[in-house]
From Swiss-Prot:
InterPro entries: Beta-lactam-related (IPR001466), Beta-lactam/transpept-like (IPR012338), Diverse_Enzym_Activities (IPR050789). It comes from Aspergillus terreus (strain NIH 2624 / FGSC A1156). Keywords: Acyltransferase, Hydrolase, Transferase. Interacts with LovF. It is an enzyme of class 2 (transferase). The active site is at S76. This is Monacolin J acid methylbutanoyltransferase.
């Protein structure tokens, strides 16, 4: 009888998946991970924690465990939260998705477009053609880019026009000029940082207060904040950031500025710290369309492709040509995608009924955090690492293994 049970366990995809995570921890391929899955009905409530929250041993020579309530840096997984906050402002009539941002973000409206450099090396700046809307910001079609992703902005910074991100002031993040006009192309950039400023100006609240009152309070969340340094209860048990050395693959502690000081203001595109369990509450609320954060019709809008065909084609070409960035994390690179209000939308099933379905919404964060909400399958999943850089092959493969196992288990009932 024992051998029959052992054989059944060995064939169970969830057992095999969990074994893969434990082996990755034991072989020091990852410090730790938290993986979670929920369904609409409440029948699936899956959480597993593996390994440690740091590679640094404590005073007892132990590695403290990574747990479901360990405060972690969300990085760009913050963008979903800021999208929700902006859509709440829309629901309350404080801003319209297609209204120009001139009224609330005149500083953004006045920003020029960097076209290039003349023969003498001087920047060529021009006025923007067209008006930026909130929809442009939420879909990364405003013409803004991150400095590290765009050669024109890297050159602009090299000439001394921009401060280093080490200053950790939001103005340095918001200062770079645009690189194209609104609606001209899909470019990943500081759009959600600007959307966060829009929420602040529309409501008269800073983004931390707004987050606490409008996301944390409705969901009973107590460990989510932009202001980690002001939360000694979270600081004492937070995860460290770990970095994988590209030369030999070894892990090392990363003394990141994000953990040493709060930003001068709230970064709507990257600034939140949260326990994995609390972030899952947000995902599950959206999956259930329970009205605690957004009206059901607004949630439905998030899952509608928001790009016109030309922009959708350009975004797919850009993503296909950028495997080193791999915005979709574990998604197949050949998949047809669009962008919704909050993340990447799959325009086809990833693997029939055995993985994410057409219409699923996903994004992530730099420490290899990947979230996805799949309305058709009735599932949401979350893979939480605190290991950089993004698109780490070990984390990516483990995330795929996790999601496949959950879908297989769920299909079996």
């Amino acid at each position: 009888m024992g051998s029959i049970i052992d054989a059944a366990a060995a064939a169970d995809p969830v057992v095999l998946m969990e074994t893969a995570f434990r082996k990755a921890v034991k072989s020091r391929q990852i410090p730790g991970a938290v993986i979670m899955a929920r369904d609409c009905s409440g029948n699936l409530n899956y959480t597993r924690c593996f390994g440690a929250r740091t590679v640094r041993r404590d005073e007892c020579n132990q590695l403290p465990p990574l747990q479901v309530d360990t405060p972690c840096r969300l990085a760009s997984a913050t963008k979903l939260l800021t999208t929700i906050m902006a859509l709440q402002c829309m629901e309350r009539g404080l801003v319209d998705l297609d209204e120009t941002v001139d009224r609330l973000l005149p500083d953004l409206s006045a920003m020029p477009v960097l076209e290039g450099f003349d023969d003498a090396g001087n920047a060529r700046l021009r006025e923007r053609r067209g008006k930026i809307t909130l929809r442009h910001l939420l879909t990364h079609t405003s013409g803004l880019s991150y400095v590290f992703l765009h050669p024109l902005l890297r050159e602009y910074m090299a000439q001394g026009h921009l401060q280093s991100a080490e200053k950790f002031g939001i103005q340095s993040r918001l200062a770079p000029p645009a690189v194209n006009d609104p609606g001209a192309e899909w470019i990943y950039g500081a759009n959600l940082d600007w959307a966060g400023k829009l929420v602040e100006r529309a409501t008269g609240l800073d983004l931390e207060q707004y987050l606490q009152e409008n996301i944390c309070a409705p969901l009973g969340i107590t460990d989510m904040t932009f202001k980690l340094q002001q939360r000694p209860d979270m600081l004492a048990r937070r995860a460290d950031q770990t970095h994988r050395n590209s030369a030999d693959g070894r892990l090392r502690y990363d003394d990141s500025v994000y953990f040493r000081a709060d930003g001068e203001e709230c970064f709507g595109g990257q600034g939140v710290f949260s326990g994995p369990g609390s972030y899952m509450k947000v995902l599950h609320s959206l999956l259930k369309r329970d009205g605690l954060l957004l009206q059901p019709q607004t949630v439905d809008m998030m899952f509608q492709p928001a790009l016109e065909p030309r922009l959708e084609e350009q975004m797919n070409q850009h993503m296909d040509a950028s495997p080193h960035i791999n915005y979709g994390g574990p998604m197949p690179m050949v998949l047809r995608r669009s962008f919704g209000l909050g993340g990447i939308i799959a325009l086809e099933d990833l693997d029939g009924e055995d993985w994410r379905r057409k219409g699923s919404l996903t994004f992530g964060g730099g420490p290899n955090i990947v979230w996805q909400i799949d309305p058709k399958a009735g599932l949401c999943t979350l893979a939480f690492f605190q290991l950089e850089p993004w698109n780490d092959p070990v984390c990516r493969d483990l995330t795929r293994t996790f999601e496949h196992a959950i879908y297989a288990q769920y299909q079996q009932g």
